[in-house]
């Protein structure tokens, strides 16, 4: 079933709202990309958006562009440590903006939106040894 992002057809009282027009294609939404940590390769999907433009969705991520002090480095993603968007996402290795990922050079926090941008950008987290 399609995801419709138009106005609700119910009033606050529970009564029906009768629309003066049909539903429009531009009001349709999509399922979330749910970018996972890939096993052997990266997988992207190109989708058509409003106005005939294109959006690149990252379905499986293998590498992340990790930045530290203005320098960037392409490193391999090992797994998802924590995800504040949904605690189940960490178990399922789903990457979203704000997720903490384990990389080859340490933990990093994701700053990009992989399902919207098609790339994983992250900033290295300073580890404090106590």
From Swiss-Prot:
It holds the Pfam family Ribosomal_S8e. GO terms for cellular component: cytosolic small ribosomal subunit. One of its GO terms (molecular function) is structural constituent of ribosome. Keywords: Ribonucleoprotein, Ribosomal protein. Part of the 30S ribosomal subunit. HAMAP family: Ribosomal_eS8. GO terms for biological process: maturation of SSU-rRNA from tricistronic rRNA transcript (SSU-rRNA, 5.8S rRNA, LSU-rRNA); translation. This is Small ribosomal subunit protein eS8. Belongs to the eukaryotic ribosomal protein eS8 family. InterPro entries: Ribosomal_eS8 (IPR001047), Ribosomal_eS8_CS (IPR018283), Ribosomal_protein_eS8_arc (IPR020919), Ribosomal_Se8/biogenesis_NSA2 (IPR022309). CDD domains: Ribosomal_S8e. The keyword Ribonucleoprotein applies.
